[in-house]
């Protein structure tokens, strides 16, 4: 709108186009990889990261309670938008520090047997599955991926699922337990440690004995697969818990 501020992702390959489209407006850029008005440096920690944010108002270190490099970039976007709207740096820091994630989106929960559950069951596409696998791969202990089908990805669904299986193996995951027609291709390409199941009950029967204090578990799948059935079944506090952050 006239007099508004355009908040632009400097890491976006089309950021130059966005700048051109907003010529004459005030702009505020953010980024992790490129120089920006709001620039971040992320230091991964267990189940989160420390994000150092340099802004026109100064520098602040924020302990994010959500994992993943993509969430660090999301935090920078939120910081830039808030600063553009007139928020103070202290308010931005407080807001980011207090954010504990959203149910089913890389939500950290305690699982039975003392295992760590990364509940990312709300939805899935190839990019978000890779991002979630990266989070699991950086988590200590044995690593198990429970993968449901990815939906609405067109005629290349088979290829995309196959590639996810290979990516999971390349990232050092120990087990891939698959549910759904296309996810069977992921389990096959994963190789040793990959298994496909016809039902949630069969999958749970194989999964539960694998859970222990040295285990990290990621549950991921598209909305229509209802993978929260798996996440809630293995969560120590069941479906009604808010998770552990």
Locations of the language-model features?
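A generic structural motif
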Residues: 52-54
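Short beta-strand elements of ligand-binding domains
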Residues: 29-33
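ATP-dependent carboxylate-amine ligase
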Residues: 23-26, 36, 47, 56-61, ...
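Flexible active-site lid/hinge loop adjacent to a nucleotide/diphosphate
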Residues: 1-21, 65, 151-152, 156
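A short, compositionally biased
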Residues: 43-50
